[in-house]
Structure formats: structure tokens, C-alpha cells
């Protein structure tokens, strides 16, 4: 039984978001729909989710003492990490003291770096993955590349959005790739993973919900990546029945091994009927923003329903849909959006995130579209995104 209090009253149910970007903003909105009190935390002020939260705090979430202080002050009933760069040791301590970390502290810790989740998937669960080696020095990095072979990919074990990642074709690239990986790690220089290149037809994100009434799957989400970030996503991605069954089996194994209730973004490579595990995020996934228009319950609504202990029941997918990012390049602390009226229409929506500033290239919004088929939906979403003019 789920008992929900009313925000700003003595019996309020309080949710603290650790990470207040565009994904956290949608989670906050879903919490608001249920009258939940929302506290948004991030490393910079005026982050998107702070606009729709009851209160907000600006801290370095990798600082365990600062994290413990704000959690002790606010006394949330649910702590919901929305990014990886968090002092997960502190979350495990707090969970041990009786606090509720979503989906659980172990999941946030294992998925914070690529080594934890890769060893769980490949070595404990025996799931198919790319070949890989880990290295923590330049010498061991050279050994790892020799073991994996060319071509290969090097990534910091702790990074996101393609930071520090290189595609290596020859030995001449090794020194530069090592240096770039050391600069791109989320917590500074350190350990890297060297991965063999997987031959695949396409990548999917299988949004998987672990809830009180079992494990549920959204229709597979296809996506296109560029420079480490997604540019378009679409649902449903067409694939064979056997490949879909195998993808669901892998996702089920992973989320049950991680534990807890919530939505997980399970990333997989698909080649014919074969499926290979890539990564998993124990939270809503950026490629899953397409579900804001493609499903009766978005990935954000599903996440909230699951971690509150409510049953999911079933997920209704409306039909072909797509998302395309609005990714301008400029420098401004006073961003404006022009021509939005020309972007929206029947079956086409726009979401603007409300990020306070931009310095270079930054994702500031997303266009959402439906279509007769996936190809048409992608074209409509891209056209809508291109019509929005960002100024500053």
C-alpha cells in the first residue's frame, strides 16, 4: 500500500532529485502530479528541475559530507539519483541507516563506473558483451590494447556523453587516446576500459521497469549517436521476435541483479537475432524522451510509479514516434527561442528545458513527433527541431 502525503504539509511525501537536468525535470513534474514535495539538487543554480521543484540546493554531489548534510536537512522519503557523478559510498551509508535510495544504492554504485556494471554483466551474469580489458596506467593501457586488438575503443570508466572516448585504429593513436581519456573522466584522471568493436546492425535502449508487479518492458527505442550524444531516437525499433526476446531476457537479468524498483535504460547492440549487452542506467534515459509522445506512461511516469511502490499494470505504446534534439552552439546567459510556432503542429511537440546558460554546444530542447511509420516520425521531429532558432 502506498500512502502519499500532500506537499508542504506536515505529512508530505518528499522526493529529492540528485541531478536537476532535463530528465530530472520530467521526474519532478510527474511527482508534482501526485502532490509530492520535490527537492532538486545540482552543482549549478537554476537547473531545469529546480524550476518545478518546491526547493533547491546547489552542492558538489561528489562531496560526501555536503551530500549527507543536505539529505539530513531535508529528510527525503525517496532519494532519486538522476546523474552518475554522486558520492555513492555516502548513498550506501545512508541506505544502511534506513533511507530509501532509488532504485537502490548498490545499483547507483555499480553503474557509476563502467567496470562495476561490465564485471556484473559479463563475469557474474554471463551475458554476452564486447571483449574488454581495464587499465590504470599508460603501460597497462598498451597491454590492454594489445590483448583486445585493433580497432578498439577506449573510455574512462567514469564518464558520460562521449567525454574522453576515442576510436583507435592504430598504435600511432595510443598516446593521444590515453591523454584524452585521462582528461575526460568524470572524477579526473584514472582507470579506463578498452573495448573491442562490436559488429551490429543497430543499437537499442530497452526501457525496463522493475516494479511491485514484476518486470515490464517498453517497446525498443532505436537511436542515432554522434560525438557521444544521441541526436534522434525512435520507437518502436523494428527487430526480429527472437532478438526482442533475447533483449528482454538480458534486460530482466540485469535489472533483477541490480535490485530495487524503478526504470532502467538498458543499452544493447543488435546484429540479426544476436543481442549484446552494452550498458545500463538505473534511471530514465535521454533516448527515452520519445516516450513523452509515444506512450500512455512516459519513462518518467513509469519511474515514479515504480519507486513509489505502485503497480505498472501495462504500458500502452501509441505507434511510430520520434525525438530529435535541439542542439545549438553559442555562448549566452540569456537564451531565447524563436520560431517555435513553426515547429509545432498536429502530432508534433517541442520541449524546451530552461537551461540557464550555454557555452559552446548544449542540448537545450527536444522535438517530438508521431508519424505513419518510424521514418516519417524521424523526419518530422528533425524538421521541427531545425525550425527552432536559438539566440542569445
Swiss-Prot record:
Pathway: Purine metabolism; IMP biosynthesis via de novo pathway; N(2)-formyl-N(1)-(5-phospho-D-ribosyl)glycinamide from N(1)-(5-phospho-D-ribosyl)glycinamide (formate route): step 1/1. GO terms for cellular component: cytosol. SUPFAM superfamilies: Glutathione synthetase ATP-binding domain-like, PreATP-grasp domain, Rudiment single hybrid motif. Its EC number is 6.3.1.21. GO terms for biological process: 'de novo' IMP biosynthetic process. It catalyses: N(1)-(5-phospho-beta-D-ribosyl)glycinamide + formate + ATP = N(2)-formyl-N(1)-(5-phospho-beta-D-ribosyl)glycinamide + ADP + phosphate + H(+). InterPro entries: ATP-grasp, ATP-grasp_carboxylate-amine, ATP_grasp_subdomain_1, PreATP-grasp_dom_sf, PurT, PurT/PurK_preATP-grasp, PurT_C, Rudment_hybrid_motif. Mg(2+) binds at residues 267, 279. ATP binds at residues 114, 155, 160-165, 195-198, 203. Keywords: ATP-binding, Ligase, Magnesium, Metal-binding, Nucleotide-binding, Purine biosynthesis. N(1)-(5-phospho-beta-D-ribosyl)glycinamide binds at residues 22-23, 82, 286, 355, 362-363. It is an enzyme of class 6 (ligase). It comes from the Bacteria. Transmembrane segments: none annotated. PANTHER family: FORMATE-DEPENDENT PHOSPHORIBOSYLGLYCINAMIDE FORMYLTRANSFERASE. Involved in the de novo purine biosynthesis. Catalyzes the transfer of formate to 5-phospho-ribosyl-glycinamide (GAR), producing 5-phospho-ribosyl-N-formylglycinamide (FGAR). Formate is provided by PurU via hydrolysis of 10-formyl-tetrahydrofolate. Belongs to the PurK/PurT family. This is Formate-dependent phosphoribosylglycinamide formyltransferase. It comes from Salmonella newport (strain SL254). The gene is purT.
